[in-house]
Amino acid sequence: MAGQKIRIRLKAYDHEVIDSSAKKIVETVTRTGASVAGPVPLPTEKNVYCVIKSPHKYKDSREHFEMRTHKRLIDILDPTPKTVDSLMRLDLPAGVDIEIKL
């Protein structure tokens, strides 16, 4: 697998969960002998939803809810077969979305 690169994108609503997951991935990859670039924090996506408080009138009375999606990027340079195997076995929390590109 010489000359290849694995790119991992992590997404989560909680920044503490995503940071601990990124730390776990970096530790696992460095233990197997591959080099790591990252975790790189990507821009946080913020969705704001505006809802009228009352069920049928009083349009001036509104409530705002926001949902933040935190993102991280990790590049693994020159991965070994042992690196790929350890990444497949890695157990991460349920609140983290993982995209792996070879």
From Swiss-Prot:
GO annotation terms (biological process): translation
Gene Ontology cellular-component annotations: ribonucleoprotein complex; ribosome
SUPFAM superfamilies registered for this protein in UniProt: Ribosomal protein S10 (SSF54999)
Gene Ontology terms for molecular function: structural constituent of ribosome; tRNA binding
InterPro entries, sorted: Ribosomal_uS10 (IPR001848), Ribosomal_uS10_CS (IPR018268), Ribosomal_uS10_dom (IPR027486), Ribosomal_uS10_dom_sf (IPR036838)
PANTHER family xrefs: 30S RIBOSOMAL PROTEIN S10 FAMILY MEMBER (PTHR11700)
Entries under NCBIfam families matching the protein: PRK00596.1, rpsJ_bact
Protein name: Small ribosomal subunit protein uS10
